């Protein structure tokens, strides 16, 4: 019954957002609104993805989880209450707040949810940077002093980035996205975020945005000093070149490149998600067929087994698998 699935994006207005999702990926953004997030695959109270293709186009991801969890996720994974991942594209016209997601132990104490995630830089303005972790030697006491004097930026580890760079962000890692970046974000299905510093600016309502200083301080890993970008090395293969990005108990992400005209196959007993970065890709399984353009995602249910892909142009894509 299931087949390769695409979904309608859900757009989120953010004060730091822009219009790059329209420019780069022809997303149908609402007019004159700063859109910071496109939720591409989501099963949350704040937004559930509606299926966009095929015979199930009147259903959504929540319906799939309630009625076809085993086919979707794979045997042994069907008892998951919610879909395990949240997939977004972020457009940061301006720098985001300095924030942290709580580790599982802290999340339980505070009533939130842990969130581990990874960023893949899809587009970057000259001089763009991300803030990840702390400078070496920064202590909690020193960090709190900088908070009081609004000089937190002096504590943050800055990393210059360009398109193609990637960063892993386990729960507890302090971070902020700099302005001028478009990012494909793969994350644990959670939306608990504690803002600790917001660059002394105001929100869409003209008032300073709420900060969550105490929960943030309890969540930050103060031993997390100067983390590095993920390796940019691809394997050498005449058909499918692979770059191993993340191999975590929550999810695995690989970056893949395929030359124009190559036909290849993917097989897994767990669900997979394909996110196209460049080119044009055709995905087929039995009679079902999906064509992806950059900025689109396709969910491959676990029950499909082998799926055929055709690179209609030179393609680059992310392959996401649940563990």
Name each region found by the language model.
Residues 121-143, 242-246, 258-270:
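Short beta-strand/loop turn elements enriched in aromatics
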Residues 100-102, 122-125, 134-136, 147, ...:
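Short, structured patches in soluble enzyme cores that scaffold and shape functional sites
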Residues 80-82, 90-95, 114, 124-127, ...:
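Ligand-binding loop in jelly-roll beta-barrel domains
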Residues 1-138, 198-231, 253:
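Transition-metal
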Residues 156-168, 182, 286-304:
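Short acidic-glycine-tyrosine-enriched beta hairpin
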Residues 131-154, 183-225, 313-323:
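Double-stranded beta-helix
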Residues 87-88, 96, 117-120, 158-159, ...:
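His/acidic/aromatic-lined binding-pocket segments of jelly-roll/cupin-type domains
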Residues 230-296, 304:
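Acidic/His-leaning functional-site neighborhoods
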